[in-house]
Amino acid sequence: MKALTTRQQEVFDLIRDHISQTGMPPTRAEIAQRLGFRSPNAAEEHLKALARKGAIEIVSGASRGIRLLTEEEHGLPLIGRVAAGEPLLAQQHIEGHYQVDPSMFKPNADFLLRVSGMSMKDIGILDGDLLAVHKTQDVRNGQVVVARIDDEVTVKRLKKQGNVVELLPENSEFTPIVVDLRQQSFTIEGLAVGVIRNGEWL
């Protein structure tokens, strides 16, 4: 984390103390009120500066979308088991952060997903591996994707035709998952861009 200005440190300390006391971060309005800013927009500018310096992470779309980053949290987040119906990158799913250079992968990786099962073993994605994932919904047929069907997250090869999606395994012991988009909820969470073999270095 880069050095903070006096004012930035005040904002950071306020966020940390508020989380410690209430279990949640303050809103922009609360920061502005506590520190005497003229408007929540002034608080937002300080939050952006803290994010640029690696002190916090801003979670878009939430009034309390602020997360403190400790030094060990720099790196790619590792997602473990995903609870039904919850966002993939929800804080409770993050097992840790690993110092992996995102630019090792093309396109850059945004997070790591711990693989469960052997349905993709024929292309070298094994149980316990860490799958590097680029967060996007812009994917093409034939690519390996991280998909959510209703409340379940899976890694498969994509084949989409009209209102029907087939998620194809790379293991003859598994059958394709067929999704009818007219009846089921389906979301692409990201594109698989690489694999890190599970090993003792983790």
Curated annotation (Swiss-Prot):
Cleavage, annotated site positions: A84, G85
Name of the protein: LexA repressor
CDD domains for this protein: S24_LexA-like (cd06529)
Residues in the DNA-binding region annotation: 28-48
Species assigned in the record: Klebsiella pneumoniae (strain 342)
Keyword entries, A-Z: Autocatalytic cleavage, DNA damage, DNA repair, DNA replication, DNA-binding, Hydrolase, Repressor, SOS response, Transcription, Transcription regulation
Enzyme Commission number: 3.4.21.88
Regions crossing the membrane: none
GO BP term (any one): negative regulation of DNA-templated transcription
Function: Represses a number of genes involved in the response to DNA damage (SOS response), including recA and lexA. Binds to the 16 bp palindromic sequence 5'-CTGTATATATATACAG-3'. In the presence of single-stranded DNA, RecA interacts with LexA causing an autocatalytic cleavage which disrupts the DNA-binding part of LexA, leading to derepression of the SOS regulon and eventually DNA repair.
Chemical reaction(s) catalysed: Hydrolysis of Ala-|-Gly bond in repressor LexA
Sequence similarity: Belongs to the peptidase S24 family.
Quaternary context: Homodimer.
Stored PANTHER family: LEXA REPRESSOR (PTHR33516), LEXA REPRESSOR-RELATED (PTHR33516:SF2)
Disulfide cysteine pairs (residue numbers): none
Catalytic residues in the record: S119 (for autocatalytic cleavage activity), K156 (for autocatalytic cleavage activity)
Gene3D superfamilies to which the protein is assigned, alphabetical: Umud Fragment, subunit A (2.10.109.10), Winged helix-like DNA-binding domain superfamily/Winged helix DNA-binding domain (1.10.10.10)
Any GO MF annotation of the entry: serine-type endopeptidase activity
InterPro entries according to UniProt: LexA (IPR006200), LexA-like (IPR039418), LexA/Signal_pep-like_sf (IPR036286), LexA_DNA-bd_dom (IPR006199), LexA_repressor (IPR050077), Peptidase_S24_LexA (IPR006197), Peptidase_S24_S26A/B/C (IPR015927), WH-like_DNA-bd_sf (IPR036388)
